[in-house]
Structures are given as structure tokens and as C-alpha cells.
From Swiss-Prot:
Keyword Phosphoprotein among UniProt keywords: yes
Modification comment: Phosphorylation at Ser-280 by CK2 facilitates the nucleus localization and increases interaction with PCNA.
Free-text function comment from the UniProt entry: Substrate-specific adapter of a BCR (BTB-CUL3-RBX1) E3 ubiquitin-protein ligase complex involved in regulation of cytoskeleton structure. The BCR(TNFAIP1) E3 ubiquitin ligase complex mediates the ubiquitination of RHOA, leading to its degradation by the proteasome, thereby regulating the actin cytoskeleton and cell migration. Its interaction with RHOB may regulate apoptosis. May enhance the PCNA-dependent DNA polymerase delta activity.
Gene Ontology biological-process annotations: cell migration; immune response; negative regulation of Rho protein signal transduction; positive regulation of DNA replication; proteasome-mediated ubiquitin-dependent protein catabolic process; protein homooligomerization; protein ubiquitination; stress fiber assembly
Domain BTB positions: 28-96
Comp. bias regions, Polar residues: 268-279
Molecular function GO terms recorded: cyclin binding; identical protein binding; small GTPase binding; ubiquitin-protein transferase activity
Protein name from the UniProt record: BTB/POZ domain-containing adapter for CUL3-mediated RhoA degradation protein 2
Pathway note: Protein modification; protein ubiquitination
Segments of this protein annotated with the region Disordered: 268-287
Amino acid sequence: MSGDTCLCPASGAKPKISGFKGGGLGNKYVQLNVGGSLHYTTVRALTRHDTMLKAMFSGRMEVLTDKEGWILIDRCGKHFGTILNYLRDDTVTLPQSRQEIQELMAEAKYYLIQGLVSLCQAALQDKKDSYQPVCNIPIITSLREEDRLIESSTKPVVKLLYNRSNNKYSYTSNSDDHLLKNIELFDKLSLRFNGRVLFIKDVIGDEICCWSFYGQGRKLAEVCCTSIVYATEKKQTKVEFPEARIYEETLNVLLYETPRVPDNSLLEATSRSRSQASPSEDEDTFELRDRVRRIHVKRYSTYDDRQLGHQSAHRD
């Protein structure tokens, strides 16, 4: 499992360097902090291939740990989950973008994972003669397709639904202009954040103009831009352009760029090996975990009052 939060050690606490005694611990879970991205996996997975990670976890190289027992690796953790998947299965689905494949290959070279380097090189060669657009905006064709896009996306999702034909009444004088401004803002945001957010257009929905924001597979917020007003004794449809609110929700959704933080139960289960630590260290550890949980819940409570435990735990 991987996450996105790394809290700095307490003031005065220094990471310590030691040799990792990995003999006979193939099924033991270890916790890794790779550039702030938290991961759980077994020693067996890390030592299956002759790589730098095998050297680290078989005692041939020194490892750096903090006071909570996290093994620190000073690399970007963006693609480390993909690296773990390759180490376990000897194969992996590569990213679609050329840039991300290059980033993954750089990490694979650092960890001396030659098989993954070869996969990346072959994928880059395949893409060499074909040009992929930098900014792709899917237009959904069905509700099922929309659900699959949102659930499978590793990025936050922003969807704009606009369908002018859904109107039952006449429009107010500024509605067409506001509808166009919503579409133009969507295009501008798509160009600005296309590498960090998946933008989706919906032209078959039941609304006239509505923004939806998703993170980690669930809806976080919705901004509906239409309302019914009464003018000259008849109903009219009014389309608004809440620009500030749209910007606010787009920035909020960026909080969900990185994978889920490990939940509290998994943190406790994987830390039992340190049960011999002093009482003061145990108290500090539980206080730190609780702080991670509260920050995480606070971040979600803006949109969803469900407890953090609603997500099932997975282990790398």
C-alpha cells in the first residue's frame, strides 16, 4: 500500500544508519518512506531480483531509518508503487505518457532493475514513431463509461456537464454568455492542469451546466450553474458563471493527486514488531499516527463526513 503523507521527525530526532538483517524475514512486512510516499511490502518482494533494494534488505548495504521505524529512501516516490508491482510479478502496466515512462525508467535505473528498464525502453521505442496529444479530454458516451473512467483514474477528476437542449423554458438574457464562459474556463483549466487532473466532458447528461469534482474514485463536490427564475410571469432558466467557486473546487481536488494514506489499523498491525520500544516512544508513535489520521479526516470532511475507515486496506 502507498500513501501521500510524510510527517517530519520530532525536533532533535535524527535518522539512524544501520544494517538491515533480512535473513529469514522473507514474509515480514517493512515500511518504506520514499521521498514522502509511504509504502508497505514484504522483504521477499524486495529481494526477489538482484537489485539495489535486494542489497539494502539483505544486509549488504546500510539503511537509514527514523525513530518511527520508517526506512528512508531519498528518491521520488511517484512511481515506487509501480516498481514494487514489477518486483512482485515480473511484469507491470506502464504509464501511457512518454514523460512518465521516462521518469519510471530513471527510477528503475537507480534501483538497478534491468528488466523494468528494458520494458520502458521498448515502450519508448514503440512511441517514438507515433505522436500522442499532450492534452486529452474524453467525451463520455455512457454512464458506465463515466464510472469506469473515474474509478480507474489515478488522478483527480473534473467533469463539466453541459447540454443546452435540456432546457424546458427560455433562457435569461445572460445565460448563453455564461454557458460559454463555463466552457471556456473548462478549456483553460484543462490546458493548465492536464498533467495533474483528468478532465472529462459530458454532453449527454440531464443537467444544463454542472461541474463535478472527484478524488480517489468518489465525488467530492458539485457546482450546479443553473436555476429556474420567474420573470414577466413565466419561468426562465438562468445559467450562472461561479468562477471563484470553480477555481476553489479545482484547487481543492488537487489535494487528492497522490495515493491514499495508510489507514490507522494497518499502521498498528505492521508496527507490532516494535512493541519492545520504551513507553515514551510508544506514546510518541501513537500521537504521530493520530495526527496523521486527524489531518486526513479534516481534509476529507469538507466534502464527506464518513470516517477514514470506510476505505479497505490493501498491502503492497
